[in-house]
Amino acid sequence: LPILMIYFQGFGITHGQCLKIYKRFGPNAKEIVQKDPYILCREIKGIGFATADRIGSMIGINRESDSRIKSGIDFVINRFCAAGNTYMPKNKVIEETKELLLVKEELIEGNIYNAFLEKKLIVQKINDIECVFIPIFYYSELGITERIARLSIQNYQTINTDIEFEISLFEKKSGINFADSQKEAIIGAFTDGIEIITGGPGTG
């Protein structure tokens, strides 16, 4: 383990990260990482693509290797989804990955296709635009859609009450004044059976 620590710390890997690497890969960690340094950003929490790519460059990994390109694609898509998106237009994936890795577009496209065949990425057209999904986001959206479809055809018991009066009464008691759009949402929740409420940051 001490020899392993010295080796990885030479790449700027912290003591804690070294322990994680050893715990995951055991005594053969050095050989495993030398063969594919990009395994670090895929399997070790806290080690990102930039670190793995720096190690790859230092040990002479081919910049056009499939492992590097696949990891770069994953990084680009995850970064885009971290901003609140659930998929990324394929042409944007290719453009940003090319900018990140400085490799040919056809290599990126080929790796997207291979990831699709391996079911590691999902490619689907939305409004005639090819889009790339991480499977967990794709199936989450699909599940939500199916659930909403089921709920929308169910029969709901009608609530016989003056909702606007109840809202007004609540406002007086609580000192809270709802905006018109908020009142519409409350009324809709009582009258429509199902309601989808969306809003960006800071909308309450």
Language-model region placement:
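Conserved ATP-binding/catalytic motifs of P-loop helicase motor domains
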Residues: 1-204
